[in-house]
Amino acid sequence: MNEVNNSNALHRSAPLAKQRGAKHYREGGAMIRHRCFGRSISRKLAAAVMAVSLLAGQMLPVMAAEDTGNAASVKNNGASATEKEVTLRVCSWEEYIDEGGWDEDEALELDNGTTIFGENSMVEDFENWYYENYGVKVNVQYSCFGTNEDLYNMLTLGDVYDLVCPSEYMIMKLMSENKLEPLSDDFFDENNDKNYYINGVSPYIRDTFETHEINGETWSKYAAGFMFGITGILYNPEKMTADEAGTWTVLNNPKFSKQITIKDNVRDSYFAAVGALQRDKLMDTEFRAQDDYSEQLKDIMNDVSPETIAKSQDLLQDIKDNVYSFETDSGKADMITGKVVANYQWSGDAVYAMDQAEEDGVKLDFAVPEECTNLYFDGWVMLKNGIDGDADRKQAAEAFINFVSRPDNAVRNMYYIGYTSVIAGGDDDTVYSYLDYTYGAEDDEEDVVDYPLGYFFTGDNSDPDYVLRAPAEQVNRQLGAQYPSQDAIERSAVMEYFDEDATKDINQMWINIRCYNIKDVPIWAWFIVAAVIGALAGVIVYHKRSKKFYLGK
């Protein structure tokens, strides 16, 4: 079975819905809603539902038949049996889309006159919008996965979907395996006012997708972005300085022995190790001034040569001895409770942790390592075996991407899940208005800074229309994590998909680190091992000679 080795798993924890902001986070609390249940709970619920269904089926067959007819009637909304209907099978991360049901006081009244309110689920609103605009009923079957590897294994085991939302490296893997359906030419038509994605995607994100390739094909041919972020160090400023936190070398800083946590996956940990190993090179001003700096940075951070893997293994074994633990999701809670003083974290989860800690009276900050940072994203791709040449289904899939990319819907999803949309909005300033609503300084605040974000919204960081007036502290907190500065973005690199041989090598490295640290073996133990091996060899030789002597005799 062609399964992904879980030692290579990258699991960004499922985001939790929340509200925050310089203007509003001080009074806001975490609002946690669930779109999909965990697998074990889902299976138990499914079993219970099935049992009840079977019992009901035995006791009330006639009523069951009537209910089936009624359900069909409701589903079709009174439509005739001949009316066209498209089924769209979507699979995305758990808790990664607005489920609606907002309270009335949650309505977002933005300065540009837009009111954002999630009454219905995003999926339900899409179904209604699609019918109104295309005259075709669409039935969205929405499923969830917990990790990229879960999704890949689901596909390998035979699950079929039309549209999925994996992370960058899994998109690259699916591209390399020729499993993706290319986006249509119509999807990129900027004259179509329903093409919200191509008309609203951030110029920076668009350029990233159009300049990165797999096997000579750009990401943009197959993928449309959804959410993005960077990695860094979440830390307690009362226990650690910004300079101490702002480098990958903090992970093996003995001053913070057993007070830091690191990600329990090979890709994130390997990236941090390479960043620390290459610190001198990455910090060199001449290197950063080169015209092809970004390309060289990408090559360095994706170096999987035997030498780099070996050096990274040695460093990660040292880091393993220095950190409190490897973790996937517990790091946020450990920071909030004060169990640790720093945590290697994804920006989206860092924002969540800062929000939650603030409710408990704890202030946390976020530092982007000065050497470099990892740019990650999740994006929509269509699966070839799902679309299967069906033009209606492909149109519905692309329409779904466009609908969630509409600026007001991008805001709904950001508000609900807490991550950062790739949508800037183009001529529609709703996203920026939401940013100002969330992080803009109050008129009477004194300690404020100008925070330019033109690189994201227009491609020009000097654009005066996109300079946010924000509380100074937010530069190193939620604002800086959710919308990184241009300086942080310029020293970011995407960690690309590794081929089969490289994946095997770094997975073996990870096994060596997580399961066995050769440096922990004392010298005297090696002498014992050598003596035992020597003794066993002697016994084998003795028996062979004895057997030869006996046979000869």
Task: Label every PLM stretch briefly.
Residues 48-57:
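Bacterial N-terminal signal peptides
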